[in-house]
Amino acid sequence: MVSIAFYGGIPGGISTPITQQSEKSKCEENTIFQPYCYNNNSKNSMAESKEARDQEMNLKEESKEEKRRNDWWKIGMFLLCLAGTTGGILWWYEGLPQQHYIGLVAIGGRLNGSGQSNAIECWGSFPGCRPFQNYFSYETNRSMHMDNDTATLLEAYHREITFIYKSSCTDSDHCQEYQCKQVNLNSSDPSNSVRVEDVTNTTEYWGFKWLECNQTENFKTILVPENEMVKINDNDTWIPKGCNETWARVKRCPIDILYGIHPIRLSVQPPFFLVQEKGTADTSRIGNCGPTIFLGVLEDNKGVVRGNGTACKVSDLNINRKDYTGIYQVPIFYTCNFTNITSCNNESIISVIMYETNQVQYLLCNNNNNSNNYNCVVQSFGVIGQAHLELPRPNKRIRNQSFNQYNCSINNKTELETWKLVNTSGITPLPISSEANTGLIRHKRDFGISAIVAAIVAATAIAASATMSYVALTEVNKIMEVQNHTFEVENSTLNGMDLIEQQIKILYAMILQTHADVQLLKEKQQVEETFNLIGCIERTHVFCHTGHPWNMSWGHLNESTQWDDWVSKMEDLNQEILTTLHGARNNLAQSMITFNTPDSIAQFGKDLWSHIGNWIPGLGASIIKYIVMFLLIYLLLTSSPKILRALWKVTSGAGSSGSRYLKKKFYHKHASREDTWDQAQHNIHLAGVTGGSGNKYCKQKYSRNDWNGESEEYNRRPKSWVKSIETFGESYISEKTKGEISQPGAAINEHKNGSGGNNPHQGSLDLEIRSEGGNIYDCCIKAQEGTLAIPCCGFPLWLFWGLVIIVGRIAGYGLRGFAVIIRICIRGLNLIFEIIRKMLDYIGRALNPGTSHVSMPQYV
């Protein structure tokens, strides 16, 4: 393609290139005045020009950046909408009432400090309750109005008024309607045979009136006392007393675990609630009935007794009934002797829980003669298919074998009061209607694991502060800065405990949840296995009537007290750690001040003997430690003269050596800076020190006492070089020389008694160390540099030589003792060898006597 551009004038004065192109290169909707191929859809077909390309690239980048900005805006709006939607869903879910949750509730404990032998406790909820420590409460909603005294059992455990939820027990057999008729039990013959008679007007037998009840078309008939049932209409329809009258509430426990509405349970001993029976004020009474399984009437008083031959005895009675089919369940009769039990409102009927090794029985007892003898009968609705949960667990027995009376008198109080509960056993689903609290609740510190972490960090901070304070002995001006920094570190550590606690709380709640899940699944599996083994006589959708007594080998998943021990131990550690932290924080400033005072050195001297037992391994606080200390003190006292003499020699020698060194250094420095006359004077001085009086110098050298620079001979006779100085005259001494020679001597000798200040050499021997705001470390450093005398560091030298002498003396005593032992052994061996030698010599002489001349007789 060939393009030729013609530039021509256009009317109006505008010069525009005119382009001629081939047919293939022509673009749509172009004009003759446009130098570019123009397209409305794509405006990027430019002329062949470098500047045009750059402009095109810039436009593309700007469009992309604008597009990105638009994309970020869209993403932000999308996230905002997503967050709003999520928050709305969460808000809706938080406020959504969750009905009929099955919570993990422990059954089978007691009220703290009372004879109430059964109660419920929150065991495994997430995460508002803590097992065995943070107990929840329950309450009833029945008002009691009497003119008597207070209801002390309720008032003793008053905590707070909370929300109320109605319990659900309509699924239980104990809340079903029964068809009952009144009967009389007549025992006229002496064979303990009791006849059942249908009558209209009933009389008491064994202290109670009786009913025959069934709900299975005579397949199963139950003979029960009339006190356990309540008639609801005129058609002989009865229900167990207390059904649908108990209101209960689980406090502060989000029941958010759902294992099914109807789990299979083997045997449940329910908690007891005080409820007021409906009736007039004169007949109102307090009954005990659980929220999930109603055991009928547990009357005003409840005693707990140990089942034995002395307390209660079984009466063997034969119940005879005419013409019946199916199962006829008769009660068990007891004659009991109870002491210290008083009924409420002076009524004759009391309720007694009798526990034995393998089972628990609920008795209704009647006392007609105001004595200690009671006629008792086992409650039919107090036993679930003869399967029981033993009341006192083997490791959690009731404190007292029997309990005294309950003060059950009532005044104008209400039962809207909560009770504090104690540890319980077992896990039982409790169906309630509640609003699920699905959020985490900030509760009290659980285990205090964060306190352990904070203790480690705080201990590190305290150790660091102690180290920095010790270093600050030589830097007094930095102590306040170090102290402030240490306080900042410790405050940050203590403030960080809350953040760590939040993490620990979530972890702890997860552990509790997992533990509760595992326990429930294990118990459920064991229950199902037990059902498969023993079978069921009668089974509903909730309960299985087995016909077997409770066995101690069943349901022992929660017998271990390891969890309780862990919780109590962690609580103790938590309190101890917090106490230690506060004590360390309060004493930190005082410890810093102590480190910065000379008292620390004095305290080290006081504590020196207390550390000797630690220096010698294995001594401890035994008597050997005191023996060793006595020997060390004895050796130190006996060796003190020699030690002092040796130390005096060492220090005096070091002082003389230092004085000689300083003297030579002093004169050498001044002689190098003065004129020839000063050099000559220095040579004369050296000649007087080293050359003159050779014999006396040798005497000083080999003298027994070390030369200290001030011997009597030196002071008595002036040296020849002194006279030589005087002969020259003072006219040759310059003012500068006078100042340099006389001034040091005067300044040094002004501390020496009896000195005139005219002998600079004598003063140089007694140079006094002056500390200018330094300490022993600066002194030693200056001594190493040669600017101070060595005696500055004499104390470590004394200590070293003293320890060497003590160790040497101990070693000498040891070696001498060893030599004495060897000498005694050698003497003993020599004595033994001498005795053996003499014995052998004696025996040898006896066996080999000396030759004797024997004359034979001669015959003539």
UniProtKB/Swiss-Prot annotation:
The mature envelope protein (Env) consists of a trimer of SU-TM heterodimers attached by noncovalent interactions or by a labile interchain disulfide bond. GO terms for cellular component: host cell plasma membrane; membrane; viral envelope; virion membrane. Pfam families: EIAV_GP90 (PF00971), GP41 (PF00517). Disulfide bonds: none annotated. The chain crosses the membrane at residues 615-635. The record marks 445-446, 685-686 as: Cleavage. Residues 499-514 are annotated as: Immunosuppression. The surface protein (SU) attaches the virus to the host cell by binding to its receptor. This interaction triggers the refolding of the transmembrane protein (TM) and is thought to activate its fusogenic potential by unmasking its fusion peptide. Fusion occurs at the host cell plasma membrane. This is Envelope glycoprotein. Residues 447-467 are annotated as: Fusion peptide. GO terms for molecular function: structural molecule activity. Glycans are attached at residues 40, 112, 141, 148, 186, 201, 214, 235, 244, 308, 337, 340, 346, 369, 400, 407, 412, 423, 484, 491, 551, 558. Residues 636-860 are cytoplasmic. Specific enzymatic cleavages in vivo yield mature proteins. Envelope glycoproteins are synthesized as an inactive precursor that is N-glycosylated and processed likely by host cell furin or by a furin-like protease in the Golgi to yield the mature SU and TM proteins. The cleavage site between SU and TM requires the minimal sequence [KR]-X-[KR]-R. Residues 577-625, 664-700 form a coiled coil. Residues 746-765 are annotated as: Disordered. GO terms for biological process: symbiont entry into host cell; virion attachment to host cell. Residues 1-6 form a propeptide. Keywords: Cleavage on pair of basic residues, Coiled coil, Disulfide bond, Glycoprotein, Host cell membrane, Host membrane, Host-virus interaction, Membrane, Transmembrane, Transmembrane helix, Viral attachment to host cell, Viral envelope protein, Virion, Virus entry into host cell. Residues 7-614 are extracellular. The keyword Coiled coil applies.
